[in-house]
Each structure stands twice: as structure tokens, then as C-alpha cells.
């Protein structure tokens, strides 16, 4: 076993997903790479299956944004479950199936930190719809004077000591984090134990929510998201 783990999140299998999984392993020989997914989906062999029962529930968000399945609101759970099932690594990196790369993690990102995300909101605006939904539909919302976001749930890096504290907190006090979109739930968790950081200053040129926000140049070193 290596001392670093890449958690490869996905919800279906086709030739492209298989190629991206294998490419990730090839580019990062010093990391173990393990796939993970929600129960009930066609997943890669050897995948960890996420047990959602011990975590917060975002079902309430579905009533207000019904075009999405509840799992769409909860990809941060993959990181927590990766640690929960595989707690003996020193470093963890969450990588979503619709991300592409052509270099190793260390070649592209600064891993000399205890955490990094992408589109950091430090803190998020109270007028943001996801913050407003949380404030309205979770009676424990006043526990958090400010709400933070770590960005998209891909290319997220944790040192063990930070992820361990996040997992312990989100399980112990899971009802505090119900109806909280993954980006703001994870960001608010992380903010309790360290500062929110980026893996590189120009990361928003590479990682976004929609393809229209990024200019894909395959000839330069990259981690791009989303690329379907």
C-alpha cells in the first residue's frame, strides 16, 4: 500500500470512464487509486460503496431543485467515505470521472499545504441561493455565522489530519449539515480546522461547473473539469 490515495468518483462505466481511470493511475504511480460510487449504480470493479446513513441528508434540497437527484447535491460524501473506509493514508485527493488530466497531481498542484480546493468562497455570500436554502431549511443553521465553499467536488486535496477532523465532525453532528449543498458543506467543515486554499492561483481557468467556463488546451499541462 502506498501512503497517498486518489478517490475516483463516478456513477456509470463506459470506455471513456475506464480510460480516464487507467490514465489517472498511470500518471500517478506513487498514489493508490480506488473508485467509489453511490449504491445502486454500475460501478468499476473494486469500487467502494458509499453508506449514506451515517452522513447528513440533502433530500430537502430536492423539493426546491427537483430536476436533480439527491446524489447530485452530495459528492462531498465521497471524500469522507474514502477516508472512513481507508483511514491509513497520509494524503487524499478527490477526482471526479468528468475530469481529465495529462500530468501528475504533484506536477500541477502545490501539495505542500494541508488542504486545497478550487472555486473558493471565503466566505460565501448570504444572498447565494444555496446559502439561503440552508439558512431557511436547517434549524441548526445559526451554528455557523459564515458559510464557506471549497468549490467543485473534484481535484480536492486533504492531508489526513484535516480530513480526519472533517469526517469526525460531519458524522458526530450530521444534522447540523442537512440540506447543505456539497460545496458549502465541505467548505464550512474545512473552515473549522484550517484555511481554505487553492492548489494553484489560476485553477479557475481549469476547473469550473460548466464547459463554457473553460478553454480546453490539451497541449499544455492540465487538469480540466467538466469534460464529458
Residue spans for each PLM region:
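Short loop->beta transition adjacent to catalytic acidic/histidine clusters or analogous donor-positioning motifs
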Residues: 2-4, 26-35
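Short, well-formed alpha-helical segments that are part of the catalytic scaffolds
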Residues: 13-27
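Active-site-proximal specificity loops/subdomain of glycosyltransferases
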Residues: 37-89
Amino acid at each position: 500500500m502506498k501512503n497517498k490515495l486518489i478517490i475516483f468518483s463516478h456513477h456509470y462505466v463506459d470506455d471513456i470512464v475506464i480510460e480516464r481511470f487507467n490514465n489517472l493511475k498511470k500518471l500517478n504511480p506513487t498514489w493508490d487509486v480506488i473508485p467509489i460510487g453511490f449504491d445502486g449504480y454500475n460501478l468499476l470493479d473494486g469500487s467502494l460503496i458509499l453508506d449514506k446513513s451515517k452522513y447528513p441528508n440533502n433530500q430537502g434540497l430536492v423539493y426546491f431543485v427537483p430536476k436533480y437527484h439527491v446524489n447530485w447535491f452530495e459528492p462531498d460524501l465521497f471524500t469522507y467515505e474514502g477516508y472512513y473506509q481507508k483511514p491509513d493514508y497520509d494524503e487524499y485527493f478527490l477526482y471526479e470521472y468528468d475530469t481529465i488530466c495529462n500530468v501528475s497531481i504533484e506536477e500541477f498542484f502545490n501539495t505542500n499545504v494541508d488542504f486545497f480546493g478550487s472555486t473558493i468562497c471565503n466566505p460565501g455570500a448570504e444572498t447565494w441561493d444555496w446559502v439561503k436554502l440552508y439558512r431557511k431549511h436547517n434549524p441548526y443553521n445559526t451554528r455557523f455565522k459564515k458559510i464557506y465553499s471549497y468549490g467543485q467536488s473534484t481535484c480536492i486535496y486533504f492531508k489526513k489530519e484535516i480530513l480526519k477532523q472533517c469526517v469526525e465532525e460531519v458524522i458526530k453532528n450530521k444534522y447540523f449539515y442537512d440540506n447543505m449543498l456539497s460545496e458549502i458543506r465541505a467548505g464550512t467543515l474545512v473552515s473549522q480546522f484550517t484555511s481554505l486554499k487553492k492548489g494553484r492561483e489560476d485553477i479557475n481557468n481549469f476547473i469550473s461547473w460548466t464547459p463554457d467556463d473553460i478553454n480546453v488546451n490539451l497541449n499544455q499541462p492540465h487538469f480540466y473539469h467538466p469534460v464529458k
